[in-house]
Structure formats: C-alpha cells, structure tokens
Amino acid sequence: MTRIRRGYIARRRRTKIRLFASSFRGAHSRLTRTITQQKIRALVSAHRDRDKQKINFRRLWITRINAAIRERGVCYSYSRLINGLYKRQLLLNRKILAQIAISNRNCLYMISNEIIKEVGWKESTG
C-alpha cells in the first residue's frame, strides 16, 4: 500500500491564522491552539472597542463644548446650547461644535449669543 501525502488545506488554514497573529508575543504567535484563542479574543476586543471609541469621542466633544461655553458665563451650559440649537433647527453636530470651540471660539460665542437672544434666557446671578 502506497503512502498518501497529506493535503495542503489544513496547513494553508494554519498559516493564514499565523499571519494574523504574527505580531503577538510568545506562544500566542507560535502555537496553533493559543493562536486561535488569541485571535478570537483580539476580534472580540476590536469589536467592543469600536463601540467604546464612539462613546469616548462623543464624551470628549461634549466636554470641549461645555468648557468653551461655560467660559462666557455661569448661567449658560452645554445642555442649554444644544436645546437652543434644536429649537432653532440648526444642524450642527457635536463634532463640528467641538472643532469650532477649539479653532474659532468667537464663532461659537456668536452662535450661542444668537440662541440666547432668540430663546430669551436671562442671565441669572446666583
């Protein structure tokens, strides 16, 4: 009976996984079982952190807008600005507002002053 040589399918699958894990440290880039486990963990972490990144950037934008707005006066806040934008139907998202707050603060003050005039919030001291 002649010897049958193994096919290349399993080897091709393992090399594909090894290429994915080539930057991992230690046995996580050398042993097939640990490579597959680490690949699953890496993909789970990447999926989770993509959502987390969106949350973190939104939080950063809100913090930047709020800091820029509160410099003008104590009574005015981020929530009032966003409420005023919705009432006037201005389509400025938080990312754009944060960029305006950093690069061109006077423009943000002009927007907020227009909203204050239209909505009619009074400056409260105390």
Swiss-Prot record:
Function comment: Binds directly to 23S ribosomal RNA and is necessary for the in vitro assembly process of the 50S ribosomal subunit. It is not involved in the protein synthesizing functions of that subunit.
Name listed for the protein in its UniProt record: Large ribosomal subunit protein bL20c
Compartment(s) where it occurs, according to its Swiss-Prot or TrEMBL record: Plastid, Chloroplast
Keyword annotations: Chloroplast, Plastid, Ribonucleoprotein, Ribosomal protein, RNA-binding, rRNA-binding
Gene3D superfamilies, per the entry: 6.10.160.10, Ribosomal protein L20
Database matches in NCBIfam families: rplT_bact
GO cellular component: chloroplast; ribonucleoprotein complex; ribosome
Gene Ontology BP annotations: ribosomal large subunit assembly; translation
Top-level division of the source organism's lineage: Eukaryota
Family assignment from sequence similarity: Belongs to the bacterial ribosomal protein bL20 family.
InterPro entries per the UniProt record, alphabetical: Ribosomal_bL20, RIBOSOMAL_L20_CS, Ribosomal_protein_bL20_C
Gene label: rpl20
Pfam families in the cross-refs: Ribosomal_L20
Alphabetized PANTHER family for the sequence: 39S RIBOSOMAL PROTEIN L20
Organism: Lactuca sativa
GO molecular function: rRNA binding; structural constituent of ribosome
